[in-house]
Regions:
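Conserved AdoMet/S-adenosylmethionine-binding subsite of the radical SAM
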Residues: 1-72
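Acidic carboxylate-rich catalytic motifs and surrounding loops in phosphoryl-/glycosyl-chemistry enzymes
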Residues: 10, 43-46, 84-97
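Local cysteine-cluster metal-coordination motifs and their immediate loop/turn environment
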Residues: 137-157
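Active-site/pore-lining binding-face segments in mid-to-C-terminal subdomains
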Residues: 72-81
Length: 200
């Protein structure tokens, strides 16, 4: 259960998806996932410039701080009821009074615990200030997801997505083929496993 982390995000509002909807669906999912996971990480919709127009057209919006606190209070109570730890991902809002801490989605402490070794990591400097993740290498790439979610910040435009052909599952690349002019460069990596002995 420790190796499985449930994410409930992005939390956004519309005529259909109101606070009551999120409270009900969160409880339904928590009941189903209880015992299979120990933690749920939530995040509220972020207004990235490239998604604003699509959100507005679809009638979707983020939550005010008051709405965030009201929903978080209900979700926190539900999480406790089902034995789940609730944390936020890269959120400035402080919800410790509701029993909700800040998460590290790339959590060096958890990774060290499940792999039974201590890891020497640093905070990922390429993320937002509120992000607590350890430095990592993302295996994804921008402008490659064909799902077309309105709230997705990873694609620049629907028009650009239409130009992507379906990926080849045998290709070493995410959504195309290696061309003769392409240059493949191996990345220099260092092991994160600490070799330093611990006294306690």
């Amino acid at each position: 259960a420790e190796r499985m982390i449930w994410r409930y995000d992005p939390i956004l509002l519309s005529a259909r998806y109101d606070l009551q909807y999120h409270a009900a669906v969160f409880e339904e999912l928590a009941a189903q996932l209880a015992g299979s996971t120990k933690k749920c990480i939530i995040s509220f919709l972020d207004y990235y410039p490239k998604i604003k127009a699509g959100l507005h057209q679809a009638g979707l919006r983020g939550l005010s701080e008051d709405e965030q606190r009201r929903l978080a209070a209900v979700m926190s109570q539900t999480a406790r009821q089902y034995g789940l730890q609730l944390e936020t991902c890269a959120e400035a809002i402080e919800l410790a009074d509701l029993g909700i801490g800040h998460a590290s989605c790339i959590d060096a402490e958890l990774l060290g615990r499940v792999s039974r070794c201590r890891l020497d990591t640093v905070k990922d400097k390429n993320q937002r200030g509120e992000c607590g993740c350890a430095a990592s290498i993302d295996i994804g790439a921008y402008n490659t997801c064909l799902h077309g979610c309105i709230y997705c910040y990873a694609n620049d435009s629907r028009r650009q997505l239409q130009q992507i052909t379906a990926g080849n599952s045998s290709s070493p690349l995410l959504c195309s083929e290696l061309e003769p002019a392409d240059k493949v460069t191996e990345r220099n990596l260092r092991a994160l496993r600490s070799l330093q002995a611990e006294l306690f």
